[in-house]
Amino acid sequence: MSKHTNIPMFRIGIGYDVHRFDNINNDDSNTSITICGIEINYHKKIIAHSDGDVGLHALADAILGAVGCGSIGQHFPNTDQKWKNAKSSHFVIEAQKKAQERGYIISNADIIIICEQPKIMPYALEMQHYIAQFTSIDPSFINIKATTTEKLGAIGRNEGIAAQAIVLCSQQY
């Protein structure tokens, strides 16, 4: 990494993640998926190498991008057994450390979950507080929202789930 004498005051990053659902409609009420750290009862499972948390994957990707550290796939490749079934909060914590090493803090995060099912908004506040807890970011600077694709494409056919995140990083003082 080159040393900059004029570090930008602000940097913005965007992240994206998508995972397929399994094809089995599981009637087992113990089946759940994890989104932004919160377990949600759902009749399908996410197919993933780690815990498959698209919200936190997108957030980690956005943080890494904001500070010029590449992508989540570069730091936590799905070909590495070390990350098998890993909790996605670990990815966000490590991305946050990279930002801090480069002189930045996360000032704001906006995460959108894209799916037809399950419904996300009943869990949004809990997700916001979960992320705030392990990142030490004020919950009012974390936003969680959800949308559908109006039944268009693979996500519209409920074959998977996606997330996008954008973060604003500011210079540490």
UniProtKB/Swiss-Prot annotation:
EC top class, as a word: lyase
Query: Which NCBIfam families does the annotation name?
Result: ispF
Reaction catalyzed: 4-CDP-2-C-methyl-D-erythritol 2-phosphate = 2-C-methyl-D-erythritol 2,4-cyclic diphosphate + CMP
> Which HAMAP family has this protein been placed in?
IspF
Identify the InterPro entries for this entry.
MECDP_synthase (IPR003526), MECDP_synthase_CS (IPR020555), MECDP_synthase_sf (IPR036571)
Q: Locate the residues binding a divalent metal cation.
A: 17, 19, 57
Name the UniProt record assigns to this protein: 2-C-methyl-D-erythritol 2,4-cyclodiphosphate synthase
Similarity comment text for this entry:
Belongs to the IspF family.
What's its EC?
4.6.1.12
Q: Name one GO biological process term.
A: terpenoid biosynthetic process
**Keyword set, alphabetical order:** Isoprene biosynthesis, Lyase, Metal-binding
Respond yes or no to whether keyword Lipoprotein is given for this record: no
Which cofactors does it use?
a divalent metal cation
Annotated positions binding 4-CDP-2-C-methyl-D-erythritol 2-phosphate: 17-19, 49-50, 76-80, 147-150, 157
Function comment: Involved in the biosynthesis of isopentenyl diphosphate (IPP) and dimethylallyl diphosphate (DMAPP), two major building blocks of isoprenoid compounds. Catalyzes the conversion of 4-diphosphocytidyl-2-C-methyl-D-erythritol 2-phosphate (CDP-ME2P) to 2-C-methyl-D-erythritol 2,4-cyclodiphosphate (ME-CPP) with a corresponding release of cytidine 5-monophosphate (CMP).
* Sample GO molecular function, one term: 2-C-methyl-D-erythritol 2,4-cyclodiphosphate synthase activity
Q: How does it assemble?
A: Homotrimer.
- Note how many cofactor molecules are bound and how: Binds 1 divalent metal cation per subunit.
Site Transition state stabilizer — annotated at 49, 148
| Gene from which the chain derives | ispF
Q: Which pathway, per its entry?
A: Isoprenoid biosynthesis; isopentenyl diphosphate biosynthesis via DXP pathway; isopentenyl diphosphate from 1-deoxy-D-xylulose 5-phosphate: step 4/6
Q: What is this organism's lineage?
A: Bacteria, Pseudomonadati, Pseudomonadota, Alphaproteobacteria, Rickettsiales
Q: Name one Pfam family in it.
A: YgbB
What is the scientific name of the source organism?
A: Ehrlichia ruminantium (strain Gardel)
